[in-house]
Amino acid sequence: MLEISFIPAFKDNYIWLLTRGKRAFVVDPGDAAPVLARLEAGGLMLEGILITHHHADHQGGVAELKARWQAEVYAPGNESITGCSCPLSGGESIDVLGQKVTVMAVPGHTLGHLAYYAPGALLCGDTLFGAGCGRLFEGTPAQMSASLDSIAALPGDTLIYCAHEYTEMNLRFALAVEPNNQALQARVAKVAALRAAGLPSVPLILAEEKATNPFLRCHEAAVVEAGLQHAASCLLGHAAQQGADIEDRSKTAIFAAIRSWRNTF
């Protein structure tokens, strides 16, 4: 089995380090310096780099790392990625230190966003966060909703390795959506204790996300009603002018309403 550990970067980024013995891959190295320090401290040899999407805080360190090690760079083929040697589009299987890893297309945050799945673990970049999901900078609500559905279909004990420590703020929003969700209330207390102790809230557990993350619960009655209320209170005038249906209860419509609410929360 691969060992997975985090390398903190910037204010709240996690660069994921995958190791087997002294061999290593890194995921989304936005900054080379902390990666170089960890590799050198552990006597590790970098063999590959996995990139989920093109944003600078996820690929900014690639050139420097590739100059030090001639590592393969696996990345979305339809995005501009420094040094990409293995362009991917989703659906491929790649070998990561002897572990078969499935490449998943998860558009939404960006159009070419990828996630990397091996049994028990998903490296998802900025698609899913603790109690939240990524902003839709390029994709549509329908695309992101479908991407989240593909993640939700994985086994419940899957550990989710996302790229940012956003859980506490996301939980505050989730409580605004579902104030009576007891699992959510318990998670708020648990995460607060972790963060107070200086510990990360990740990796996430998929089953817990499905019980507490509003973006994975757009089919639940409480989330549907909260989404409709937000649409009615914030979008009524515009919707009426445009002839839009603010009573649309489809999962995509509710996701769009909840995501819009989160953007201004």
Curated annotation (Swiss-Prot):
Thiolesterase that catalyzes the hydrolysis of S-D-lactoyl-glutathione to form glutathione and D-lactic acid. It comes from the Bacteria. The lineage of its organism: Bacteria, Pseudomonadati, Pseudomonadota, Betaproteobacteria, Rhodocyclales. Zn(2+) 2 binds at D57, H58, D126, H164. Its EC number is 3.1.2.6. Its cofactor is Zn(2+). Transmembrane segments: none annotated. Pathway: Secondary metabolite metabolism; methylglyoxal degradation; (R)-lactate from methylglyoxal: step 2/2. This is Hydroxyacylglutathione hydrolase. Zn(2+) 1 binds at H53, H55, H109, D126. Monomer. Binds 2 Zn(2+) ions per subunit. GO terms for molecular function: hydroxyacylglutathione hydrolase activity; metal ion binding. Belongs to the metallo-beta-lactamase superfamily. Glyoxalase II family. GO terms for biological process: methylglyoxal catabolic process to D-lactate via S-lactoyl-glutathione. It catalyses: an S-(2-hydroxyacyl)glutathione + H2O = a 2-hydroxy carboxylate + glutathione + H(+). It holds the Pfam family HAGH_C. Keywords: Hydrolase, Metal-binding, Zinc.
